[in-house]
Amino acid sequence: MCGHSLGEYSAMVAANAISLQEGLSLVHKRGKLMEKCPKGSMCAVLNVDLDVINEICSKVEDEIKTIVTPANLNSPKQIVVSGTEEGVDEVINRLKDCGYKKCIKLKVSVAAHSKVMSNTLDQFENELNKINFSLPEYPIIQNVNNKIPNNIDNLKENLLSQLVMPV
């Protein structure tokens, strides 16, 4: 089983790693914590290689001292960039300057799967530790590392990591 980003919680419920109530509780608390983070932005970039996006994001981070990174690796031809408003806007401008025109700004105010979400880690880890996890009855391919967890700590670590890492 697998679920992308928030869908990983659905996969855990379907695999009986957590109950439906626990899944809903975690998703709700995750959302509330994300809302408390600094505002951010996300943009879907189409038909640009990941290497090009990584290079531009890295240069923008270094040059203007901001956070911007590939966040959702939806397909080889659709990658979502996430970070500060300033960082995402600069990546869009540089992509367009290089001739890449397909950049679609998402209607969100959070920078999911980026270091902008770092403030959530300690609190969300506390929430994860309140949940009664079980090993999944069916294999779950985790988002951050593309592996099947072999223990409960792996399940928790992945849910925590996906707040600040690409999925």
Q: What is the meaning of each model-derived region?
A:
Residues 1-2, 81:
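Helix-rich "cap/lid" substructures immediately adjacent to catalytic or cofactor-binding pockets
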Residues 2-11, 19:
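Gly/Ala-rich beta-loop-alpha elbow adjacent to hydrolase catalytic centers
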Residues 14-166:
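Alpha/beta catalytic cores of group-transfer enzymes, especially the acyltransferase/condensing modules
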